[in-house]
Amino acid sequence: MDIKEYFKYDFKSAVVVFLVALPLCLGIALASGAPLFAGIITGIVGGIVVGLLSKSPLSVSGPAAGLTTIVLAAITDLGYEAFLVAVILAGVIQIVAGFLRAGAIGHFFPASVLKGMLAAIGIILILKQIPHAVGYDVDFEGDQSFFQNDGQNTLSELMEAWEYLTPGAIVVSIFSVIVMTLWASNSLQRYAFFRTIPSALIAVVGGVLLNTLFVHAFPDFVITEKHLVNVPTLKEEGSILAFFTFPDFSQILNQKVLIVAFTIAAVASLETLLNIEASDKIDPFRRITPLNRELKAQGVANLISGAIGGLPLTSVVVRSSANIQSGARTKASTITHGLILLLSVILIPRILQLIPLSALAGILFVTGFKLTKPAIYKEMYKNGWSQFLPFIATVLAIVFTNLLLGVFIGILVAVFFILKTNFRESVILVSEGNNFLLRLTKDVSFLNKATFRDLFIGIPSNSSITIDGSQSHFIDHDVRETIKDFMETSKAKNIQVHLKHIEI
């Protein structure tokens, strides 16, 4: 696609992604025990570096909520400077993995699981943003795990939030949702103004203006500083270097550093592959991202991020889905969002500090709903149980655990149905009177052993069975042994067994 031709769409999307990414970068840095500016660095590198090197048209990268536990433990154990060495090494490992074509792993994620992951992220966005929408900002922005670092969980946090309602925050979040919803309506999208200006920007500006009105006219509704975006600012000219932390390379051979590096590389790569596959699923142009190239791009970005004091990064579904839903066409939106993030924290940090978190919660509400619309569940149900059950298992598992564990559980359920289908379709048994024909229709592995035993048990006495392997190129040794055993036991039941294209 021509980047120049579609830049008007990409710029609008970049603004939306920037507004979504800003609090997530800060929240994940806070939860990881890292300097707040480390989250900003990671978001900038994820946008610009990955955007330039990756072939993904719509994926957006940044600090990952799924790594916060690993990062927090590593920083506590190693110290931040040594941890940065681990991030650099993790990047190197990812680059090597890309050259070794490890990206092929991403092709093995079932579609039902990927769709379940997207729907689960939508539910999590809605549930996790409710406390922020009502003015209870204890849990960090971007948390996706059911069990939180503050001892609460997603559901108990909702109960807790109702005891700390902030009227002004509620008004702003409702205003944000209304703006986002009406702006997307067909009646308004007919006009160029509404197609050009991002609704998320209006929601945020409106939230800032509402809080300004509260300050001057409705003091009981004022949203205080702790419920606003907290962006680090320069206290004195020339102090920008104070925001950067540099790695301690004397720790490069530290065994603990190496273990953390491999752990980060493995988890970050897996999350990236999952998120890339999921993003490709909702790309309206159905483009396919080269996964090995993506691993290399992520590796280079992690290397750079670690070198200048940033956190490990991955492709992130929340940012990517916001990008796609806002109408992005090319990766220019990803790069532009990184540039906006860079320029805004340098030039207008004081203005960013006026943004209510509840305004951003409204934006994420709408993003979450689009990911988990009822129509998605209806569609998966129509596709049959073999698609719906892995889908719904993935949704529930992710919502009540975390992303990676939930996906793993979903894959197990999907594999069960794959094996069940394979058992059913690999052999066909037909009969006419006491004459049976057992035809092997595809390659038969040891997994089919139980199927053969069950079929053989059902063959009645004084009958005849022909086992035809002419359509099967491979028959596992265990299956051959099962057939051989049946030939021995069938003599007692006066069953005649004939083999066709099968050697025992």
PLM segments and residue spans:
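Membrane-embedded helix boundary and interhelical linker motif in transport proteins
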Residues: 53-57, 66-87
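Short, non-helical or kinked segments that cap or interrupt transmembrane helices
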Residues: 32-41, 55-68, 106-114, 194-201, ...
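The feature marks cytosolic C-terminal regulatory regions of anion transporters and related permeases
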Residues: 370-504
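Helix-loop-helix junctions within the multi-pass membrane cores of secondary transporters/permeases
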Residues: 62, 84-109, 118, 288-359, ...
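Hydrophobic alpha-helical segments embedded in the membrane of multi-pass proteins
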Residues: 19-23, 38-48, 64-66, 92, ...
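Core transmembrane helix bundle of multi-pass membrane transport proteins
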Residues: 1-12, 76-102, 106-286, 350-351, ...
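Alpha-helical transmembrane segments of multipass membrane proteins
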Residues: 25-27, 47-52, 70, 74, ...
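Membrane-embedded helical hairpins/re-entrant loop segments and their flanking transmembrane helices
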Residues: 3-15, 20, 24-57, 250-332
